[in-house]
Amino acid sequence: MKKILLHIAAILTFTSCGVEHKEITCSDNCISFIKNYERCSLTKYKDNYGYSIGYGHLIKKGESFDRITKEQADSLFIVDINTYVLPAVRRIVKKLKFEPTQGLIDGLTSLIYNCGEKGLTKTTFYDRLLKSRATPDNTWREDDKNFTLAALKECRIPAKKTGLQESILNRRNMEKSIINETFKF
């Protein structure tokens, strides 16, 4: 049921920059990747942005969570993906001059879940992505793709804990593989 809700809320077809973009949804593999990487905490914890719970759900003003069940963590995760992450992915995809692959959609989904839309849009990776050109068959030009992915490592969140930067760089390398569609889920 949860996967159905996620996919129903995530389907969208639109045209931008002369490119008709089809269904914009993250894959089940992407969902599993993010959940596995974020890990589930059933009790609230402090991070760089305040208190979080579940799979990195930032507890907002007016929400009160000290402890939740796994099912509640899954529900919060799906709501966050549908409410914040996929709309941000759609806004970015609308600006592209080429048809995104599922790998790019999944990579952007993971990046935005981890860095936030504002965090991502302040990077060289984002600037290069928007400047990337299409091939005659409307795919991402390989030279632009390689140039853009080289900047992916800068997409970081502030890390106060020792070793966290290495973990973030590992995640960026995995997201690069997801975008290149060479990642083995």
Predicted segment positions?
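Structural motif
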Residues: K95-L104
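Extracellular beta-sheet repeat scaffolds used for adhesion and glycan interaction
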Residues: G62-F65
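Sec-dependent N-terminal signal peptides
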Residues: I4-F14
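Short N-proximal segments of mature Sec-exported proteins
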Residues: L104-G116
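Long, amphipathic alpha-helical surface segments
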Residues: I8, G18-N48, H57, I68-N82, ...
